[in-house]
């Protein structure tokens, strides 16, 4: 093998114990096939990939339980040991005794993740030839998966992330009446959206919309049936208020209506809602569940042997050079020793305690992919911790400390917490954020108390154990590994396991003690989301039923009015009802009271629209009064003239037209004869006629004067 070999197709795994003088190291080179995005680096001890290291001086043999390879990364690390394929049991005598071998080791760096350098020692002092295990801590694993997700952003969503959701959706479909189905559909849609699979995201969001539309249709049908029955049995006398109505006044209805008209669901699902802080009893129970999950995760890896950590050593340099993260086997023994009442293996405990969980719908929102197979019911945790002051005992001096800081948590547990806190673009953070959001709603859906109690401790480690997960990840520019920086940070506390005991106790106290302000803030957020959810449902119901109810009320009032009026009066009559009794108002009327407080028409004007003045302080006795009816009548103006007057006027007009015509004709002819030819036949005839008529006129005037004088 030389430097030109592709790093991703020939991955070499080795223990980092090759540069110690006086040690006899046996190396076995194993080629692992290149796999996909999933980091499957846990190796079974009985397979061909088992890595064995032997120490000739000490006579101990250890089995590597987990390597630190990320199969998607091909960056060379700064480790100084490399495998030799043609030599076994070759003594490593230091730089001076065997320089060619060391030089060859330096030429062939193993292909590792750059973040895996934090878990490997740079060198060990002479004389202390103890094989150091390479363990992948939570930070490096989470970072590797984040980089892999960034590189393979166009890949389809991971099946393990959506498989629990699909199983829950199938369970909800089997029930046929579950209210949690739209929540699961929304979570699947958001998961696909974060994975940039927009087609499937649109399909699931459309399914959620169809569910809510059918829900609104069903609610509208129920409301119509209730309104019909209410109108049929509406009493004519005022009924006394029932006991259920005494505790819910108008202000409560107004507050509910305000919430229902101002919510923004499901836009709030994008927010990262803080989990509800449990009580001290549940916090101690959360610690027991976390330790139990660590045991189950380590047992699921199928390691045949458990590696014990070395006890206290006279030389303090050894603990300073030792990586801050211990091997998985060390973690397993430590957690079992710290809590002896917990079962040793999680497989048996999981099969025994699984029937105690009555509802598995909350598992999706409260667990990650790494802890999905090792989850136990709340009964196991309650058996492990029976009082509120029960916390896991700190590790003894025979084992390394586990909880000295957030980075020392078991690998699978730390990976789950790291992915929850970083909020990368994978499918898992979307599920967890939606889990927090849907948990508040499912409380309103009256889920069993046991499942709600089980879901609370699952969200706790985000705020306590992952407070500083990425601060030690930055390596120095001169090539120093993270183990030396961890030694400088912890100081003398990392020298002996006895010193780690105090650190364990302090860490547990910090995780159990939470600020009351954070608890109140989280409770306020959860209550606000619950109110928004109820508000959205009520608002849609009101909008659907408002039009139908108003139309029916108008028809009923108009029909009552038309029965009392004649056909002519009914065509011009409108009505205005007095406000009805408040005790018989429906939700629509209450909502209208909030939107339109009061509508008073101007004096002297009559509105042609139906008005409803609902005053809050109206007395129930007003319903007994007959509603006043205001009638508006229109009459046509009688402006027709009598027949006699019309005939007389026509005659006068005709006479006037005749006189005007005579004058025009006579005057025109006279003007023509005066200015024109007098000897023309027309003028001659006109002169004869004028003489004749003028003579007759003079005779008539003379006779008239004679009769006037005589009278």
From Swiss-Prot:
The species this protein was found in? Mus musculus
Identification of the protein by name: Consortin
Query: Where in or outside the cell is it found?
Result: Cell membrane; Golgi apparatus, trans-Golgi network membrane; Cytoplasmic vesicle, Secretory vesicle
Q: Which UniProt keywords apply?
A: Cell membrane, Cytoplasmic vesicle, Golgi apparatus, Membrane, Transmembrane, Transmembrane helix
GO BP, one annotated term: positive regulation of Golgi to plasma membrane protein transport
Q: Belongs to which family?
A: Belongs to the CNST family.
Per UniProt, the ranges with Basic and acidic residues bias are: 396-407, 457-471
The record's GO molecular-function terms, alphabetically, read: connexin binding; phosphatase binding
Query: Region Disordered: which residues?
Result: 1-157, 294-332, 370-389, 394-432, 457-496
InterPro entries per UniProt: Consortin, Consortin_C, Consortin_N
Give the transmembrane region(s): 651-671
Q: What does this protein do?
A: Required for targeting of connexins to the plasma membrane.
Q: Which Pfam families match?
A: Consortin_C (PF15281), Consortin_N (PF22883)
The subunit field of the Swiss-Prot or TrEMBL record says:
Interacts with connexins GJA1/CX43, GJB1/CX32, GJB2/CX26, GJB3/CX31, GJB6/CX30 and GJC1/CX45. Also interacts with GGA1 and GGA2. Does not interact with PANX1.
Assigned GO CC terms: plasma membrane; protein-containing complex; trans-Golgi network; transport vesicle
List compositional bias (Basic residues) regions by residue number: 109-120
Q: Where is the composition biased (Polar residues)?
A: 63-77, 478-487
